[in-house]
A protein has these predicted regions:
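Conserved GNAT acetyl-CoA-binding A-motif
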Residues: 107, 114-126
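Conserved GNAT-fold acetyl-CoA-binding loop/helix
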Residues: 9-37
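C-terminal "cap" of GNAT-fold acetyltransferases
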Residues: 80, 125-131, 139-141, 147-190
């Protein structure tokens, strides 16, 4: 868990100093809540860590359960809930590995998992509302912005920019970047 939290802290610092955004400036919903969410996702096998030797290079969380706000209300609008989708969260690449296509490879890997393991036709992500650079990144990864719920209906939920992508052929050759290890399915970058 410390590796994931370390990657998130590193990303938060970079976002604050280099991108002038408040994304992850404070743990959401608070330190304890963030810690519990990360731990639960790890224990349930939803969070994956990409390792380069003993160094954590990136992390991604994939989940068939839709994200919820603080009142346990779904983030995605009702009209979209019937579509089979895999939800992607907490995609973080260490700055040391930035610009090498690792984020794109993780998203392509998630699309493959969505189709292969869950029969899903979409991968979805809810992106920090005010981080327009990140919105542009996801658009560059073949995601389309979708209309969400009325922001007044969501309780203190900072990621209200909703994006989805059809599960198609990957844009990257993620299989060359990852080598599966052990029966936990951890991935190492090569």
């Amino acid at each position: 868990m410390d590796e994931v939290r370390g990657l998130v802290r590193e990303a938060a610092e970079w976002l604050r100093t280099s991108k002038d955004t408040d994304q992850w400036a404070d743990p959401w919903p608070d330190r304890t809540g963030q810690r519990e969410r990360i731990l639960n996702d790890l224990l349930k096998g939803k969070t994956w860590i990409v390792w380069d030797g003993t160094t954590p290079a990136a992390t991604i969380t994939v989940d068939t359960d839709e994200p919820l706000d603080l009142n346990d209300q779904p983030v995605w609008p009702a009209r979209k809930r019937h579509e089979p989708a895999l939800y992607v969260r907490r995609v973080v690449v260490s700055r040391r590995y930035a610009g090498k296509g690792l984020g794109a490879a993780l998203l392509d890997w998630a699309a493959n998992v969505a189709k292969r393991d869950h029969g899903a036709t979409l991968i979805r992500v809810d992106v920090w509302t005010t981080n327009t650079d990140l919105h542009t990144y996801y658009k560059g990864q073949r995601f389309i912005r979708r209309k969400g719920r009325d922001p007044r209906d969501l309780t203190n939920y900072p990621s209200q920019a909703l994006f989805e992508r059809e599960v198609t052929q990957p844009g990257s050759d993620y299989k060359k970047l990852f080598v599966e290890e052990g029966d936990r399915g951890e991935r190492k970058s090569s």
